[in-house]
Amino acid sequence: MQFMIMQTLLVQALDAACRKAEQNGLVLTMEQRQMLCVQREQTLRNAGRLEVGLGVLPALIETFSQSPYLDKRNAVQELTELQQIFYAAQNLTHDTLRDADLLAAMRSLYDGLCGGDTAELAAQSEEVWRREAKKHSGR
């Protein structure tokens, strides 16, 4: 029962995030949203993580839909890679960064230093994540 409630809340949060993303030109179909949810579960398993609550996916969609570098034609793949990077960075920093701060740091690096290159973003060190997140903390 609790699982069904969380799934319903996740779907509602995704719908709200996707409505906001549409304002930035990112339109995700229901099939693409479902694919992102499946990828989310796989990413969590691969990262050895368990997520309580709605997780980062809705906020990640909202945050990166504003990026000029996000390839809207290949958004599911890029958003999946960004989810993987988020959880890898959380593991690397031992979950000491707030989700919002890490997302802001990711976006700053993705749009700046990395020029939209997810491989470059994934290669960042713990020190870089901490420094960038600190710049964005409390916003």
Describe each PLM feature range.
Residues 1-4, 64-66, 135-139:
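Short intrinsically disordered terminal tails
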Residues 2-57:
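N-terminal interaction modules that seed assembly of large macromolecular complexes
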Residues 7, 11, 15, 58-61, ...:
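Generic detector of well-ordered alpha-helical segments enriched in charged/polar residues
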Residues 19, 33, 40, 45, ...:
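Arginine residue identity/basic-tract feature
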Residues 21-31, 46-51, 68-73, 91-97, ...:
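Charged, low-complexity interaction regions
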Residues 44-81, 121-125:
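Short, charged early-sequence alpha-helical segments and their helix-coil boundaries
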Residues 76-139:
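Amphipathic alpha-helical binding modules
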